From Swiss-Prot:
Lineage, uppermost ranks: Bacteria, Bacillati, Bacillota, Bacilli, Lactobacillales
Described purpose of this protein according to its UniProt entry: Part of the Sec protein translocase complex. Interacts with the SecYEG preprotein conducting channel. Has a central role in coupling the hydrolysis of ATP to the transfer of proteins into and across the cell membrane, serving as an ATP-driven molecular motor driving the stepwise translocation of polypeptide chains across the membrane.
Gene: secA
Protein name stated in the entry: Protein translocase subunit SecA
Native species: Enterococcus faecalis (strain ATCC 700802 / V583)
Keywords tagged on the record: ATP-binding, Cell membrane, Cytoplasm, Membrane, Metal-binding, Nucleotide-binding, Protein transport, Translocase, Translocation, Transport, Zinc
Binding-site positions, Zn(2+): C829, C831, C840, H841
């Protein structure tokens, strides 16, 4: 381990030496750039583009291009990037992460690699965590890029499709991570090429990269449509679980945040709902509603996981503390919370398209990111995204005083001490930023400060719209600001007059977060660019982290020291090590979970990429899809004939082939059993393909010209692909939940998921080709046929990381079962074989 760390440190030093050399080359161009007029400086952009087109690489253009941006920034913004910012810019261009401390000017650092990579004409995306930052940076930095002759676009939720398309076609596009992901999904749901907005994904710089690629990595973006399910069952399930008692009727595992009924709870459910067996197949819907009602009532907490405003349940982002407008928990959890809170229950939704940030951002040709806290997650960035983390030195030494943690026995004694500390600093005039992990805590502390007559501002999910204004004033003399995790990331807290003499900004943490990174972000609000500052964390044995991990040893330690007073306080290196050890364990668990989820997600990623690529080929086709369509017809015929001719020739099911031909390929009674006798299997295939070709030609002639034929082909293919794909997403989701239970049978759930997922995908492809064949060959031709989306979807927020963990560990004794409508004996088998049900899967029914 020691050798590994030594090697890493040596590599960092070597990389810094390389960056210094390139920075020297940039510096060498400074005086020449200073001599140029504004017009000459602007003309450099066209010169660079021409040199790039002639074969010069971006790496070769870098020193001069960075020098141009540096000089332009001085003239337009009044800012001249320091050497450390040049080094950070080089790291970003290389597709890595420069770890730069708060206040070191990451926004300005990004302008140089953004400009350089925009010269290729393939587009650069600058990604921020919220629309405020995207709008601010596109306006402020846009002046610089416009001065240099580059176009800048802003992509936010309120933009129309035309405005989004225009923004994506700019040289540089500012956007939020959510909007990029949703636009990608929407582009793969449209039915006309003209409706697409994105270009191929080229180069992205992700601001606050740890927040997006680590904290939100497992968060899937979901486009959903309405599913037809009754909301009454949510109310019944909610009424039932509210009467249950913990430990007697249900049990909660605090560490994994899972919940399940006990035997007594199951018996109560069976009595209440009049059932013999709660986990019978017919009761799948009820068990699902009960599971979600349990989680809604006893796992999901008001003012922590969500808030209720204007009679609506609104999700609170666990990592930023912001309300996530327009987002809903999926899989019925949101409806269960609505039932719990007594607000109107909205219709349940069905997933139509989904992708995680991990898989979206891995599609870029080159990916880079910026943050002040990435080194603790360096392994994850390297393993999953193939990105290195390089620590960039600060422009000035950090003189902030980071004090050891203070431990109190109870929450009450801890908060009393916090209020006393704030009161003392307030009367002195020193500005204070207090970090809390939840809305609930910020409001509790606010009440205590009101009682102590200390004026203050509260920044949490309930008033996030005032964020910029609150943070702007947080460094003024006598300011007291309480903030949840977001703490105004991306917005600098600038110190007011006279604050330096008072010791700078004081940061107080009211408890440790699960991640050391989030704690470091809070500390980093103070002491920017060599300013003085102080940080202090207050902890109690009743904090969530302490209850979940390692508090027993600390309790023993307190007993040994005979600490009994309510307001006793401890500062100890042993205690600090315990806390950091607990945090490392949580970080390790979370990383393992994210890695595991990614392995599952990769199965869907491969399938999604194939489907989306084929879908795009159909939409982009401008001449003819007849070969594609006839290819589907031939493969469908091949599959059906093979399935009916597997046995000895005397036992071939020729009746089944005739049934298939009549229902799917040709007019009824045009092919008989006699036509197929005395032919080999290959000859039967050729015969059916020839007859299908005749019908195909006949259909083609019914349409007025090649253009209408192409349009009809697109309508048929897109409609079938979209319907089958959304069903497949649901089926894969159910498979994923069910394979988790197979671990009990000594089977590897991931291998089972990969194997069955591959089989289900092949079945879906066969089903698509069968349905396209049937629809094209048997449908009535209409002249005015138009493409339509299968359903109109809306963006939906999935459950958070903790919820996902809980879902994957559900302790109920059932597997999701897909119940289809009843099939008649003489109907075609729904498997797509073309046989009658009685001759196929219904043979043993």
């Amino acid at each position: 381990m020691a050798n590994f760390l030594k090697k890493m440190i040596e590599n960092d030093k070597k990389e810094l030496r390389r960056l210094e050399k390139i920075a020297d080359k940039i510096d060498a161009h400074a005086s020449a750039m200073e001599q140029l007029s504004d017009e000459q400086l602007r003309e450099k952009t066209d010169e660079f583009k021409a040199r790039y087109q002639k074969g010069e690489t971006l790496d070769e253009l870098l020193p001069e291009a960075f020098a141009v941006v540096r000089e332009a920034a001085k003239r337009v913004l009044g800012l001249f990037p320091y050497r450390v910012q040049l080094m950070g810019g080089i790291v970003l261009h290389d597709g890595n992460i420069p770890e730069m401390r708060t206040g070191e000017g990451k926004t300005l650092t990004a302008t140089m690699p953004v400009y350089l990579n925009a010269l290729s004409g393939e587009g650069v995306h600058v990604v921020t965590v919220n629309e405020y930052l995207a709008t601010r940076d596109s306006n402020e930095m846009g002046e610089l890029y416009n001065f240099l002759g580059l176009s800048v676009g802003l992509n936010i939720n309120s933009k129309s499709s035309d405005e989004k398309r225009e923004a994506y076609n700019c040289d540089i596009t500012y956007s939020t991570n959510n909007e990029l992901g949703f636009d990608y999904l929407r582009d793969n749901m449209v039915v006309y090429r003209s409706q697409m907005v994105q270009r191929p994904l080229n180069y992205a710089i992700v601001d606050e990269v740890d927040s997006i690629l680590i904290d939100e990595a497992r968060t899937p973006l979901i486009i959903s449509g309405q599913a037809e399910k009754s909301t009454a069952l949510y109310t019944r399930a909610d009424n039932f679980v509210k009467r249950l008692k913990e430990d007697e009727d249900y049990k909660i595992d605090i560490q994994s945040k899972t919940i399940g009924l006990t035997e007594a709870g199951i018996e109560k459910a069976e009595q209440t709902f009049g059932l013999d067996n709660l986990y019978d197949i017919e009761n799948t819907a009820l068990t699902h509603h009960l599971d979600q009602a349990l989680r809604a009532n006893y796992i999901m907490l008001l003012d922590i996981d969500y808030v209720v405003q204007d009679n609506k349940v609104l999700i609170v982002d666990q990592f930023t503390g912001r309300i996530m407008d327009g987002r809903r928990y999926s899989d019925g959890l949101h409806q269960a919370i609505e039932a719990k809170e007594g607000v109107e229950i909205e219709d349940e939704t069905k997933t139509m398209a989904t992708i995680t940030f991990q898989n979206y951002f891995r599609m870029y040709k080159k990916l880079a990111g910026m943050t002040g806290t990435a080194k603790t997650e360096e392994e994850e960035f390297r393993e999953i995204y193939n990105i290195q983390v390089i620590q960039i030195p600060t422009n000035r030494p950090i003189i902030r005083d980071d004090r050891p943690d203070l431990l109190y026995p109870t929450l009450e004694s801890k908060f009393n001490a916090v209020v006393e500390d704030i009161k003392e600093r307030y009367h002195k005039g020193q500005p204070v930023l207090v970090g809390t992990v939840a809305v609930e805590t910020s409001e509790l502390l606010s009440d205590k400060l009101n009682a102590a007559k200390i004026p203050h501002e509260v920044l949490n999910a309930k008033n996030h719209f005032k964020e910029a204004e609150i943070i702007m004033n947080a460094g003024q003399k006598g300011a007291v600001t309480i903030a949840t995790n977001m703490a105004g990331r991306g917005t600098d807290i600038k110190l007011g007059l006279g604050v330096l003499e008072l010791g700078g900004l004081a940061v107080i943490g009211t408890e440790r977060h699960e991640s050391r990174r989030i704690d470091n972000q809070l500390r980093g609000r103070a002491g920017r660019q060599g300013d003085p500052g102080v940080s202090q964390f207050y902890l109690s044995l009743e904090d969530d982290l302490m209850k979940r991990f390692g508090s027993e040893r600390i309790k023993t330690f307190l007993e040994r020291m005979n600490v009994q007073e309510e307001d006793a306080v401890i500062q100890s290196k042993m205690f600090t090590r315990q806390v950091e050890s607990a945090q490392k364990r949580v970080e390790g668990n979370n990383y393992d979970t994210r890695k595991n989820v990614l392995q599952y997600d990769d199965v869907m990623r491969e399938q999604r990429e194939v489907i989306y690529a084929q879908r795009q080929e159909v939409i982009m086709e401008e001449n003819d899809l007849s070969d594609v369509l006839m290819g589907m017809v031939k493969r469908t015929i091949g599959r059906v004939v093979d399935s009916h001719t597997q046995l000895e020739k005397e036992e071939w099911n020729l009746d089944g082939i005739v049934d298939f031909a009549a229902s799917t390929l040709v007019h009824e009674d045009t092919i008989s059993k006699k036509d197929l006798e005395n032919k080999s299997a290959e000859e039967i295939k050729d015969y059916l393909v020839a007859r299908a070709q005749e019908v195909f030609e006949e259909k083609s002639q019914q349409l007025n010209g090649q253009e209408q034929l192409l349009e009809f082909e697109k309508v048929v293919i897109l409609r079938v692909v979209d319907t089958k794909w959304t069903d497949h997403i649901d089926a894969m989701d159910q498979l994923r939940q069910s394979v988790g239970l197979r671990a009990y049978g000594q089977n590897n759930p991931l291998v089972e998921y990969q194997t069955e997922g591959y089989s289900m995908y092949n079945n879906m492809v066969g089903s698509i080709e069968y349905e396209v064949t049937r629809l094209f060959m048997k449908s009535e031709i209409r002249q005015n046929v138009q493409r339509e989306q299968v359903a109109q979807g809306q963006a939906e927020h999935p459950e958070t990381e903790q919820d996902a963990a809980a879902q994957s560990n559900t302790s109920a004794k059932r597997q999701p079962v897909r119940v289809d409508k009843k099939v008649g004996r003489n109907d075609l088998c729904p498997c797509g074989s073309g046989k009658k049900f009685k001759n196929c899967h219904g043979r043993n029914a």
